[in-house]
Structures are given as structure tokens and as C-alpha cells.
Regions:
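Cleft-lining beta-strand/loop regions that shape enzyme active-site pockets
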Residues: 32-35, 48, 73, 186-196, ...
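Stable alpha-helical elements in mature extracytoplasmic
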Residues: 36-40, 64-68, 77-88, 175-179, ...
């Protein structure tokens, strides 16, 4: 009981100290407090992944941080908090000297960034020397907080991170714990740290006020969402996401020719189907222009690139909410219409999944003019062998529609076997190493290539767009190995590599990409997306006419190749 009272008083002091200068989130922290918290958060994360005693779980490391936050905030000057951090280092078991420590003999794709750990403005020179000694000598072979499973090709797992579900609106120390936990995980175990628009070492300082001054659970969740958005990763989701309401209108929209266009009905509301037309352009929602809404939502929409940000905004956020009625303004044929549209429970609507363009179609079929067509989400294990044979044997070519997320039936080996393709190195990946936090090392994965030059390979056209993400992008890379294959469409999601899940205080769940994926020449798929041979995008006129212009172009390419 006495310990709980002491901790409560420390939290109260911390909150008062860190909030005494301001009470809104757009006001910065006093410089001294900003520096001291950055130093504390970065040292805490460094020790978590580098010091053997901490990595082994000998301490309740969250609580070690929480106990020190009030002390750092209340420090009267820099010398006080710098001494506190130096004493903290001295309190840990000494690390033995290890002159034999060296990096693995592997190509380095990404090197660590230690932020302010070696900056004398943040630490005493003697403290920096101690940090350097730990870095150069400590050996961590297993870590309570992170695991790399080589049996799963280096799959990364973030482990033993409590989410404190009883703290729906965490007090200040736990909000800072969330910020420090996330920042350090990204700093040491995110493979694309160097691709972020903002230098990651500057993010901690910028985001401190957002977490310090979050006045309620909603502001805290939005601070977390803004933080996740800064990794520029389409895998970087956050749950709960307050941008997404429980209700939604009974139609889907998509950005086409830089305008928000109605593309498909998802419910049976007769009023909506009477008033709204496919191809309508929505110019305003609840009195706010589309451009203004996009600008407001971009900082809270995690994605690898701009097309995927628009995908997220249009598919989940624009027309969803918790009120039953939404007011929209529609432009159609130079006329303007105002409608009140009812929202429905999202679960009752027939929404497409990851952009699957034809959810009711079979996985393998033959189009007109004897062209094979594969829709991976609809592919079933029991149909695979006959299906692959059906679309490849005697056809002019095959279209693989990757504007979607594939099913669990991995069809690549069957294509490889049917086309008599052999294994060859194609895809490159970068993986982390628990013993060397912050480093990512390059490895090769097997893929496919042609075995016999004289073998007839049918023309293969792969269709992609912003819904082509993760495993779908893997498929594209694999199919690109087939000689003569062509990729058409627009920028893909740019988020390949296995997903890593972890928790933040306040019952919050988030994700990130856990390993790097690259083309054989070392070029990035992350953020840039899959390599495209011909850019093809839908038009508003095509949507109005009910045409699939990308599919039409794919058919044209195959027909042209047979002339």
C-alpha cells in the first residue's frame, strides 16, 4: 500500500510538472523537460535491447521507466537529471569486456541510429562512455521483449509488452511509456526506418507534447495514430481507429482522376439507388469540402504512399461515422445535388474485401477469345491443379488480377511446376538480429525462373492498383519472373514483408512490417510499390459506363501478343 501511495504522488508531481507550462497539444514542452524526457526514453529503450540483465527480464522494465519519469520531470536543472540517468546505469550489473564481439559476415542493409545517446547535450561524457562500452561489449542472445524465429525465415515477434487494458485513458507516465515503447521498437526493429519521410530520431521530440497534453482517451488514441502514421507503412494500423465509425453509407467510393467517385452499391437502400448514380462525384460531406477533409485526415492515415492514404480515407473514413444521417453534395453532368443519406451497420453491408473487383466470380475461368483469368481471392486448394491447367493450356495468355488480397491457397508453385520453371534467387529480404538491435542483414529467398529457353510460355499480364498489398505484392514479384510477363495498373500499397503485432498501454493494438523485401537489384518495394510496366488507371467515364478499363487493357495486350 505504501508503495502505491508513493507512486501515486510521483505520478501527480510528474503530471503537474510536465503540464504546468501549457494545456493544449500544440504547445511545446519547456526545453529542459523535452531534453530530459528524450534522454530518458532513448536510454530506457537502448538498455531494454542491449543490456543482458534487462533483456533477460531481470527487471520490470516498464516500472523502472515509470518510477523515473516524475524524477526527471521534477529535476531543477540539467545536471540533476543527467546525474540521475548516470546513476541508473551504475545500478545495473556490470557488462564484462568482450573483445571478440563482431558483426555477422552478412551484407548490412540498415544500420542503427542511436539518436541522442552519444550527444553531450543530453548525457555526461562519462555516461556516454558507459553507453558505448555496453554497445561494444554486451552480448544478448535472447531477449524477453523481442524474438526472431529463424524457423519462420526470420519472422520478428514483439513479446511481453503489457497493454494495461484497465487504463483506457492512461495517466501521463503510461502515455509516455506508450510513446517510448513504440519509438524504440521502430528505432531498433523496423526494416524501413530510413525510408520514413521524417527522420525517425526527430519524431520522439515532436510527439512528446501530443502525449503529454492528451486530455482524454480520444486525444491519446489520436496521438498514437499520428505516431503510427509517421512510419509511412501501409501495414501500420492502429486499433481502435476513431476515424472509422460504426456506421457507413450503402455504397463505396474511390479516388478517380483526383475526384471522389461512387463506384459500387453495397446495400439495398432504394432511396440511395434512386438518387445516387455510379460515377457520381462527391464534392462535400457534412458541409466540408473533400480537399479539406483529406488535408485534415492525412496525418492520421497510416500508409506507405499517397494513393494508399487516399484508399484508406475513401474506403473507411469519408462516409463512415456514428451518426445515422450524412449530408453529401454530388456533382453529375455539370449539375449539383444535395442528399441526406442514411448510414447502416457496416457489418450488414456487402463491402468488397481489399478491393476484390469481382467477389462473386470463380478463381479460374476462361474469358472471351480464349484468355485465361485468375482471381486469387477466389482460388481454392481443391481446384488449384485443374484451375492452373485450365488457364494455361492452349490459351492465348493468362490475366492474373491482383487488385485484391489472395486467399490462403498459394498458387505460385503450381504455376512454376506447370510451366517447368526452376528455383532461382529472386527476392531479397532484410532481417533483424536480436544480438545487434538496429541492424538489418540481407538474405536471399528462392523464387522461380525459366528452365528451358525453348519452352512456350503463354503471355502473362498482372493487374495491380493501390489494393495490391503485402502477400499480393509478393505474388506480383513472383509472377514478374515469368518471361514476357507484363504488369499494368497503378501504384501498389508498397508494404511487403511479414506483419508484426504488438500492444500499447490503454488496450491499443498496432502493427508494422517486420522484415524488408527487395527486388534482386536491391530496389525497394516498400513505399514505391511493385514495378509497373504500363500505367493504366480507371476513368470516371469508364466507371459510369460500367467498364473495367484495366481488364480491357490486359486483354488487348494478350491479343496483340498473338498477332
Amino acid at each position: 500500500m505504501k508503495q502505491h501511495i508513493i507512486l501515486f504522488l510521483m505520478f501527480t508531481l510528474c503530471y503537474t510538472s510536465c503540464n504546468r507550462k501549457a494545456n493544449v497539444s500544440d504547445v511545446g514542452l519547456p526545453k529542459s523537460e523535452e531534453k530530459s524526457l528524450v534522454a530518458l526514453g532513448q536510454l530506457w529503450g537502448f538498455l531494454k535491447y542491449h543490456h543482458p540483465a534487462v533483456a533477460n527480464g531481470n527487471y520490470d522494465w516498464d516500472m523502472e521507466l515509470i518510477k523515473r519519469i516524475p524524477l526527471v520531470c521534477e529535476a531543477k536543472n540539467d545536471s540533476v537529471w543527467k546525474k540521475l540517468l548516470d546513476n541508473w546505469l551504475d545500478s545495473l550489473p556490470p557488462v564484462p569486456e568482450n573483445p571478440n564481439k563482431k558483426l555477422p559476415n552478412l551484407e548490412i542493409k540498415l544500420k542503427p541510429d542511436y539518436g541522442e545517446l552519444f550527444n553531450p547535450e543530453y548525457f555526461y561524457p562519462k555516461t556516454i562512455d558507459k553507453i558505448r562500452f555496453i554497445l561494444d561489449n554486451a552480448v544478448v542472445t535472447t531477449n524477453r521483449y523481442v524474438k526472431v524465429d529463424e524457423k519462420q525465415q526470420g519472422q520478428l515477434f514483439i513479446t511481453n509488452e503489457p497493454f494495461y487494458n484497465e487504463l483506457l485513458y492512461p495517466e501521463l507516465s503510461y502515455r509516455l511509456l506508450a510513446l517510448f515503447r513504440y519509438w524504440n521498437i521502430i528505432n531498433y526493429f523496423f526494416p524501413y526506418r530510413e525510408l520514413c519521410d521524417q527522420k525517425w530520431s526527430t519524431v520522439l521530440t515532436e510527439m512528446l507534447p501530443e502525449f503529454v497534453y492528451a486530455k482524454n482517451r480520444e486525444e491519446y488514441i489520436f496521438a498514437c495514430l499520428k505516431l503510427v502514421t509517421k512510419i509511412d507503412d501501409s501495414h501500420g494500423t492502429l486499433s481502435p481507429n476513431l476515424n472509422i465509425g460504426l456506421l457507413s453509407v450503402p455504397f463505396e467510393v474511390q479516388f478517380i482522376e483526383n475526384q471522389l467517385v461512387v463506384t459500387r452499391f453495397t446495400g439495398n437502400d432504394s432511396y440511395v439507388k434512386e438518387k445516387i448514380k455510379i460515377g457520381d462525384v462527391i464534392t462535400s460531406i457534412n458541409g466540408e469540402s473533400i480537399d479539406a477533409i483529406v488535408k485534415k485526415m492525412l496525418p492520421y492515415t497510416p500508409a506507405s504512399n499517397y494513393p494508399v492514404k487516399l484508399r484508406g480515407i475513401s474506403s473507411s473514413m469519408f462516409l463512415s461515422g456514428n451518426s445515422t444521417i450524412v449530408n453529401i453534395v454530388v456533382q453529375r453532368d455539370e449539375k449539383t445535388f444535395h442528399f441526406k443519406i442514411r448510414r447502416y451497420d457496416r457489418r450488414l453491408l456487402n463491402a468488397t474485401d481489399y478491393g476484390n473487383p469481382q467477389p462473386d466470380k470463380e478463381g479460374y475461368r476462361i474469358l472471351d477469345n480464349n484468355i485465361g483469368y485468375v482471381l486469387p481471392p477466389s482460388c481454392k486448394v481443391e481446384e488449384r491443379e485443374q484451375g492452373v491447367k485450365k488457364v494455361l493450356d492452349g490459351t492465348k495468355g493468362v490475366i492474373i488480377d491482383m487488385r485484391c488480397y489472395p486467399s490462403n491457397d498459394y498458387i505460385i508453385p503450381s504455376f512454376k511446376a506447370h510451366l517447368k520453371l526452376r528455383q532461382e534467387y529472386n527476392m531479397m529480404i532484410s532481417k533483424p538480429n536480436v544480438s545487434y538491435p538496429g541492424y538489418f542483414f540481407m538474405h536471399k529467398l528462392d523464387s522461380i525462373s525459366q528452365e528451358t529457353k525453348n519452352l512456350h510460355i503463354p503471355k502473362v499480364v498482372i493487374i495491380v492498383n493501390e489494393y495490391t498489398q503485402s502477400a499480393a505484392e509478393d505474388y506480383v514479384m513472383e509472377f514478374q519472373i515469368i518471361p514476357g510477363s507484363v504488369v499494368i495498373g497503378s501504384t501498389t500499397a508498397g508494404a511487403d514483408g511479414r506483419v508484426v503485432n504488438f500492444d500499447l498501454p490503454g488496450n491499443i493494438y498496432t502493427r508494422m512490417t517486420g522484415w524488408g523485401v527487395y527486388y534482386p537489384d536491391g530496389s525497394n518495394l516498400q513505399r514505391a510499390g511493385a514495378k509497373i510496366d504500363e500505367v493504366v488507371k480507371p476513368t470516371i467515364a469508364g466507371i459510369k459506363a460500367g467498364r473495367d478499363e484495366l481488364l480491357e487493357r490486359a486483354i488487348e495486350i494478350i491479343n496483340e501478343s498473338n498477332h
